[in-house]
Curated annotation (Swiss-Prot):
The keyword Methyltransferase does not apply. Zn(2+) 1 binds at C315, C318, C333, C338. Its main location: nucleus. One of its GO terms (cellular component) is cytoplasm. The lineage of its organism: Eukaryota, Metazoa, Chordata, Craniata, Vertebrata. This is F-box only protein 5-B. Proteolysed; proteolysis is induced by both cyclin B-cdk1 and cyclin A-cdk1/2 complex through probable phosphorylation. Proteolysis is inhibited by pin1 during G2. Part of a SCF (SKP1-cullin-F-box) protein ligase complex. Interacts with btrc. Interacts with skp1. Interacts with cdc20. Interacts with pin1; stabilizes fbxo5 by preventing its association with btrc in an isomerization-dependent pathway; this interaction is present during G2 phase and prevents fbxo5 degradation. Interacts with plk1.
C-alpha cells in the first residue's frame, strides 16, 4: 500500500530535475505531472500539498520564458538553503535551529497535522447525529448510565427500585424494538400487529382465510375476536359461514336439543325443546318396534334348525336366539359375533361337571318342637 505523504524534495534533486526539463523543453514540450489515483482517497477531505510541489498550476506549459523565470527563483531559494542545510529529506523537518524553519513549518504542519488520524476524526461528522439520538435504545442507555453514575457516587449498592422507576417512567419506545420476542416458544403475531396498529397487514392476512377458518379464529382469544370484528369484510363472511353451518346441521339433525350441537341459539329455544322431546320419543318407539320384528324373524329362522331335544332361549348378553339343551341346562348363542356358551341356571359360563351354586338343594330347617295345631301336638296333648 502506497503512503500519501510527500516530503519536501532536496534542492539538489530539484536542480537536477530542472536542468533535465530545460534540456527536454528545447526539443518538445513537457506534459504536466498528474497525482496518483489513490492519493485523494488516502487524504480524504485534506487536499493541501506543499507550496513548491507543482510549478505548472499558475504558469502555462508552453511559455518558455515563464518556465525559465520559475527555475531562476528555485535557484535563489536553493542558494539560501545551502547556507544553513547540508542534507535533504526528513532532517529539514526535524531540525529546530535552522533560520528557515518558520517558512518550512507552515508547509510541513499543513501536511503532518491534517494527515494524523486524530485530526482526521475532527473533520468527520460525530457518530451520534440527530437520527441516532432518536433511537430508543440509545436514549435508554444514556438514561440508565446517568442514573447508575449518580447512584455510584452516593452508595456502592445498586437501588433497583430507582432503576425500575427510570424504566417505567421514561417514554423510550422500547416496545417498538425489533427482536424483543426472540427466544420465546410462542409468539402471538396477530396480537402484536394489532397492538402496533398494523391494520393493513391484518386485512391482508384475513383475506386469505375462508369462513370456517374465521369461525375458528374468533374462538381463540378476545384480541382475535376484536381483530375480526373491526374488519367488516371478515366479520360479514364469518356471519354468513355461521348461518350456512347452522342450516347444514339442521338438515342433518332435525332437533337441536343440546347447546353443544347448536352453534347459534334462536329466541324460541324452549318451544324447540318441547317439539324435540316428542320427536325423540316417537323415534324410540319406532326403533323398538322395528327391533322386535327383526328379533322375531331371527327366532323363527333358528327354530327351523332345532333338534327334538332342543329348544330356544334368549342370550344373556345380546338377546339373540340360543339353542337350549334341557338335560344339560346348557345354551349356545347362534349369533356369530357372540357365540356365548352359558348355563341356564346361574347365567354364567358353562361349567360342565361342576355343581351349580343355584342348583344346590335347599337345606330346610327342621323344627325341634311341633307346631301348634299340628297332628304331633294333638297326639302329645292326648298322651298327657
Amino acid at each position: 500500500m502506497m503512503c500519501g505523504f510527500t516530503s519536501n524534495p532536496s534542492p539538489k534533486k530539484l536542480l537536477s530535475k530542472s536542468s533535465a526539463t530545460n534540456v527536454h523543453l528545447e526539443i518538445s514540450p513537457v506534459k504536466p505531472d498528474r497525482p496518483c489515483k489513490g492519493y485523494e482517497n488516502v487524504l480524504g477531505s485534506c487536499t493541501t500539498v506543499a507550496k513548491c510541489a507543482d510549478l505548472t498550476d499558475d504558469l502555462p506549459v508552453h511559455n518558455k520564458e515563464n518556465l525559465l523565470h520559475g527555475f531562476n527563483d528555485l535557484e535563489r531559494h536553493h542558494d539560501e538553503e545551502n547556507s544553513s542545510l547540508q542534507d535533504s529529506g526528513y532532517s529539514s523537518i526535524l531540525q529546530n535551529d535552522s533560520p528557515c524553519q518558520d517558512e518550512t513549518d507552515s508547509n510541513v504542519s499543513d501536511i503532518q497535522v491534517r494527515d494524523t488520524p486524530k485530526n482526521l476524526m475532527q473533520y468527520q461528522k460525530p457518530f451520534h447525529t440527530l437520527s441516532t439520538r432518536c433511537l430508543p435504545i440509545l436514549r435508554f442507555e444514556a438514561a440508565m448510565c446517568s442514573t447508575l453514575k449518580k447512584m455510584r457516587k452516593t452508595s456502592k449498592k445498586i437501588d433497583w427500585n430507582a432503576v425500575d422507576d427510570v424504566v417505567c417512567g421514561g417514554n423510550y419506545g422500547l416496545e417498538h424494538l425489533i427482536g424483543k420476542s426472540m427466544g420465546l416458544e410462542r409468539v402471538d403475531i396477530l396480537a402484536e400487529l394489532f397492538h402496533r396498529d398494523f391494520k393493513h397487514l391484518l386485512t391482508k392476512i384475513l383475506r386469505h382465510l375462508n369462513a370456517m377458518d374465521l369461525i375458528n379464529v374468533i374462538g381463540v382469544s378476545t384480541t382475535w375476536r376484536k381483530i375480526l370484528q373491526k374488519d367488516n369484510w371478515a366479520y360479514n363472511t364469518y356471519k354468513l359461514g355461521c348461518k350456512e353451518l347452522c342450516e347444514k346441521r339442521a338438515k342433518v339433525s332435525t332437533h337441536t336439543a343440546t347447546r353443544d350441537e347448536s352453534l347459534c341459539r334462536v329466541p324460541l329455544a324452549s318451544v324447540q325443546k318441547v317439539a324435540a322431546s316428542s320427536l325423540c320419543t316417537s323415534k324410540k318407539q319406532n326403533k323398538n318396534g322395528g327391533l322386535s320384528n327383526n328379533r322375531h324373524a331371527e327366532f323363527i329362522e333358528v327354530a327351523q334348525t332345532l333338534k327334538n331335544d332342543q329348544s330356544l332361549k334368549a342370550c344373556v348378553d345380546c338377546g339373540s336366539p340360543a339353542k337350549y339343551d334341557s338335560y344339560l341346562h346348557r345354551a349356545i348363542c347362534t349369533r356369530e359375533s357372540c357365540k356365548l356358551d352359558f348355563c341356564t341356571l346361574c347365567s354364567c359360563k358353562y361349567h360342565s361337571s361342576k355343581s351349580c351354586l343355584i342348583s344346590k338343594p335347599r337345606s330346610y330347617r327342621i323344627p325341634i318342637e311341633p307346631l301348634p295345631g299340628s297332628k304331633k301336638s294333638k297326639q302329645n296333648l292326648r298322651r298327657l
